[in-house]
């Protein structure tokens, strides 16, 4: 019968103690970025930017690759979140207080959002006529350009971003398994379809 070993401690320290090509299977659920603060110095998931978090995750997975046998597999559980201000503070207040960009409101890592092409920013076009008020609203004809920002309430797509970062580092992403949770925590947002 095969022995199962559970290693507890800092992931980078525990992985460095392990020999190359010694693990058949890794099952991991690393801390999701910006969602839990365990009040522990250097904790994974509390990096100032998503780019720093993804860089750290790729570095950790390089150590996992080193200890994984050529026939080994990795099972990764990584959750998502929505772009919002933490604890009700605005993005500007949070950044001013702690130089922290985990609010997602003004981060240059997404290709969606309100970053507009200045060449089109001043032109406007009619959008909708309101027969009750007699007013015609206008909208900017500016175009969103690559390098834009996530908007409030956007799904951040963190698992996808991590999967792409790992693919870029040479990992294979073989499948995505949706974890159906029949008794999941209720979603009180009221502005989006529940994910379960």
Question: How would you describe each model-predicted region?
Answer:
Residues 2-196:
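Core catalytic lobe of class I
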């Amino acid at each position: 019968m095969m022995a199962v070993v559970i290693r507890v401690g800092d992931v980078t320290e525990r992985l460095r103690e392990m020999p190359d090509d010694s693990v058949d299977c890794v099952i991991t659920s690393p801390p999701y970025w910006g969602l839990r603060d365990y009040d522990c110095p250097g904790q994974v998931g509390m990096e100032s930017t998503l780019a720093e978090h993804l860089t750290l995750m790729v570095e950790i997975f390089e150590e996992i690759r080193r200890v994984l046998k050529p026939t080994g597999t990795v099972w990764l559980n990584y959750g998502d979140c929505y772009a919002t201000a933490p604890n009700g503070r605005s993005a500007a207040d949070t950044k001013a207080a702690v130089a922290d960009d985990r609010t997602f409101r003004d981060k240059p890592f997404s290709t969606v959002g309100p970053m507009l092409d200045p060449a089109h920013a001043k032109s406007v076009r009619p959008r909708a006529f309101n027969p009750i008020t007699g007013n015609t609203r206008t909208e900017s004809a500016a175009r969103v350009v690559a390098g834009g920002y996530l908007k409030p309430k956007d799904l951040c797509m963190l698992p996808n971003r991590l999967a792409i970062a790992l693919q870029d580092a040479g990992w294979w992403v073989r499948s995505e398994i949706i974890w159906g949770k029949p008794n999941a925590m209720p979603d009180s947002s009221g502005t989006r379809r529940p994910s379960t």
